[in-house]
């Protein structure tokens, strides 16, 4: 049998290696899916979100999957240990209302008035508070955040770009309880960190550093985050939301 031309041999070898790799991957996927190979839950893309496990490369995917399924979202929310009550689904106006929402009574931090949040929003809030905010407070102040000052969640209104709610504009994520506005934090010793007063993009002091880390950390767990650098309407708070286009400003 004549040998193939020398210039064809690397191509043939490459095709064989590619085929072998595809077969190996397929066998591995089947083995994992059928349980022949046991994969730790934190590295298993089919395992449900573990809300208390340290975030890894699969956390964003698992969080998005939980947010997208009402049953999975409620199951994950139940594992957080937060105190809340279910809010009946209802329409409160054109483009406004609640679906799969909760009234958050306690979240490991004091919240003042209990915000009404969609399940995806409440789940993202826990992930941010537990895995981003509290570690940042311990890093910069050596103590946890005891309370969060907020400006509310649900409001049946349009998008606000700085001059108030705009007639004819799309509905805000607040209109479906998919947004939460955070104005500042109270530390365990009573000190306050305030977005309007303490925000500095250069993070030149502990308060500014905490706010910068809280803002950046929020971008890992929420779909959209807007802060003082976005526009004047957000100079005094962080706007956190789920749904819509991804943004971190």
Ranges and model annotations:
Residues 39-49, 148, 205-211, 220-223:
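Electrostatic, structured charged patches in enzyme active sites and in nucleic-acid/phosphate-binding
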Residues 62-149:
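Active-site acidic/histidine clusters and adjacent loop/turn architecture
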Residues 39-54, 97-110, 190-191:
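Short, compositionally biased low-complexity segments
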Residues 10, 15-23, 168-249:
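Catalytic cores and adjacent binding grooves of peptidoglycan-active enzymes
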Residues 58-64, 115-126, 168-169, 195-205:
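Second-shell loop/turn segments in exported
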Residues 94-100, 156-162, 238-239:
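Short, solvent-exposed polar/charged micro-motifs at secondary-structure junctions
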Residues 1-86:
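Long non-globular sequence segments
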Residues 137-177:
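Active-site-adjacent substructure of cysteine-protease-like catalytic cores
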């Amino acid at each position: 049998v004549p040998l193939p031309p020398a210039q064809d041999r690397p191509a043939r070898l490459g095709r064989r290696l590619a085929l072998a790799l595809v077969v190996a991957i397929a066998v591995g996927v089947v083995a994992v899916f059928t349980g022949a190979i046991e994969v730790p839950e934190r590295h298993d893309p089919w395992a449900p979100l573990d809300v208390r496990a340290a975030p890894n490369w699969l956390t964003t995917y698992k969080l998005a999957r939980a947010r997208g399924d009402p049953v999975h979202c409620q199951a994950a929310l139940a594992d957080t240990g937060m105190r809340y009550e279910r809010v009946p689904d209802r329409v409160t106006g054109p483009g406004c209302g609640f679906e799969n929402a909760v009234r958050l009574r306690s979240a490991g931090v004091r919240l003042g008035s209990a915000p009404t949040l969609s399940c995806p929003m409440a789940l993202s809030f826990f992930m941010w508070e537990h895995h981003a905010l509290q570690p940042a407070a311990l890093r910069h102040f050596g103590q946890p955040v005891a309370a969060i000052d907020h400006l509310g969640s649900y409001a049946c209104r349009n998008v606000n770009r700085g001059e108030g709610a705009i007639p004819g504009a799309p509905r805000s994520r607040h209109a479906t309880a998919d947004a939460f506005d955070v104005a500042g934090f109270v530390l365990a010793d009573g000190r306050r960190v305030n977005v309007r007063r303490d925000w500095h993009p250069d993070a030149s002091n502990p308060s500014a550093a905490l706010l910068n880390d809280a803002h950046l950390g929020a971008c890992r767990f929420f779909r959209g985050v807007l802060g003082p650098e976005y526009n004047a309407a957000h100079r005094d708070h962080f706007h956190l939301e789920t749904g819509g286009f991804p943004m971190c400003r």
